[in-house]
Amino acid sequence: EICACLVGSEMCIRDRAVTASQMNRLLNPPTTCNELPKEVCQAQDSLKLMLLLQGMPYADLAHLHKKDIQGDLLTCRRRKTGTELCVKVVPEAMRLINLYRNQDSSSPYLLNFLSGTLKGEAAFNEYGRKLRNLNFQLTRLSELCGVGDIKVSSYTARHTWATLAKYCHVPEEMISEGLGHSSLEVTRTYLKSFDGDELAKVNQVIINYIYSGKKKLWSRA
């Protein structure tokens, strides 16, 4: 996954990541792009939410459970690795969570992206359709925002979060933990886990970089 790119070749990160200014343009279109089609706007919200939640993958975002959020703390296990992920929910992310909060009491899911009523292959197919549509709408978003020369997909937020963190000199071990990776096991045998407050600061550094355009190097001070 991304961790392999951080430790080894950076080429695959660059292929999926965008610059801070490009992400800003995607999340805050120029005046001519303000009236986005509804489905494109929803895809933009998903992109923003994935970014604000420490580069959370769409698979994890769509399958978040209502019980996973307590106050402004989101705690879940990654579907791919089973690694526990704890994210402090910033106000804008909470606004989007509330906007898409699932009102169906019979569904276990926090967000209304999936029905929560399907099982097995039917549930798998539903998720596949949602993911394909998200990627299609993100391509439309990039074209409408004048960045159609870059490939934007459900991976973009995650890879961009990791890349910008690295540009801001955040230690790779913190990036790995922020993303909920199970890799870098050798490093983790002698490194303490980073607490939630430190990861929240990392996330805020990246958010500020994208929204203000000001790059601030990571510091624990």
Features from the language model and the residues they span:
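Active-site/catalytic core of tyrosine-dependent DNA strand-transfer enzymes
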Residues: A17-T19, M23-N24, V90-D149
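Short, basic (Lys/Arg/His-rich) helix/loop patches that form interaction surfaces
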Residues: N28, T32-K38, N135-E177
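Single conserved hydrophobic/aromatic residue that forms the stacking wall/gate
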Residues: E1-G8, I13
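Conserved tyrosine-mediated DNA breakage-rejoining catalytic core shared by Y-recombinases
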Residues: H63-L99
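Short, charged phosphate-coordinating catalytic segments
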Residues: M50-G71, E173
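C-terminal secondary-structure termini that scaffold catalytic or DNA-interacting sites
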Residues: S105, F113-E121, Q204-A221
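Short, polar N-cap/turn motifs at the start of nucleic acid-interacting alpha helices
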Residues: K67-T75, K151, V170-T189, K214-A221
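Catalytic-site neighborhood detector that most strongly recognizes the C-terminal catalytic loop/helix
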Residues: R78-G82, L179-Q204
